[in-house]
Structures are given as C-alpha cells and as structure tokens.
C-alpha cells in the first residue's frame, strides 16, 4: 500500500488533472472519497476476482451465492461483475453501461455503503465531460492493496 504522503499527493494530482474546472473545490471529496473506496475494494478483491465471478455464475440460479462466496474466498464482501476499475479501462466507450454494472455487482453490504455516496450525479457529470475514463485511469495507478 502506498504511504500517507503518496496518497495525499495522488489525491491533489487527481484534483488538478481531472476535477479542477469541472467541480467546485468543496465537491472534490464527493468524487475522491468514493473512488478511493472503490480502488481499495478492488485491491482487496483482486486476487479472488475470477473465482468470485465463477462461483457467482455457477450458483446464482440455484441459491443465494453470498454466504458461499464469502466462506470460500475468506472475504466479507465481493464484486461479481466482470468489471473492476482496471477492467473498465478496457472499454472506454462502454463506461456509461459498464460502470453502473460494476457498482451493482458489489455484495449487498458494500452496495449499501456505495449508495450513500450518491455517485450518480458526479459520475453523470464526469461522463458528460469525458472525464470518467481519465479518473478511472488515474485511480488504477495507486496501490491500495493490503500489506
């Protein structure tokens, strides 16, 4: 994981490169915090991502896959969509559809937290101004993996 100074510097660089002029300074946190959380979640899930997708797809028609996925992966949360921030970069033209798919793929315990961020409006603004891809690209550069 990056250290505090690296994370702080990263955040200010993102604000300068992506958010300045598009959002007011007091709105930066409405974008930065949720994307930091998303990146951290992705980094925790990353080693088990393919296993999660496979398990979810195998079980979803028969049972609630949540407890089985949690038990088998040892994680308390997961994302069963085919996307994470890194994979979203592979289809820049599909972000309008794929980003909501990514968000809705989180397990219920995380999805409820993400709903409270009310990301729809900032993401809509980023999409409209062709900045969502740039923001996602920036956030995939920072290492927020657990130590």
Regions inferred by a protein language model and the residue ranges of each:
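Non-catalytic, mostly N-terminal accessory regions of nucleic-acid modification and defense proteins
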Residues: 1-147
């Amino acid at each position: 994981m990056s250290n505090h100074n690296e994370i702080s510097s990263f955040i200010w660089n993102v604000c300068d490169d992506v958010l300045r002029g598009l959002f007011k300074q007091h709105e930066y946190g409405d974008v930065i915090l949720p994307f930091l959380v998303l990146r951290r979640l992705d980094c925790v899930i990353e080693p088990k991502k393919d296993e999660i997708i496979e398990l979810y797809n195998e079980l979803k028609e028969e049972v609630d896959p949540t407890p089985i996925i949690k038990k088998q992966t040892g994680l308390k949360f997961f994302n069963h969509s085919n996307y994470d921030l890194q994979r979203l970069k592979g289809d820049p033209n599909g972000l309008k559809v794929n980003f909501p798919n990514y968000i809705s793929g989180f397990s219920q315990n995380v999805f409820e937290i993400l709903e409270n961020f009310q990301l729809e409006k900032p993401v809509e603004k980023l999409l409209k101004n062709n900045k969502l891809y740039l923001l996602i690209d920036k956030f995939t550069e920072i290492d927020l993996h657990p130590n």
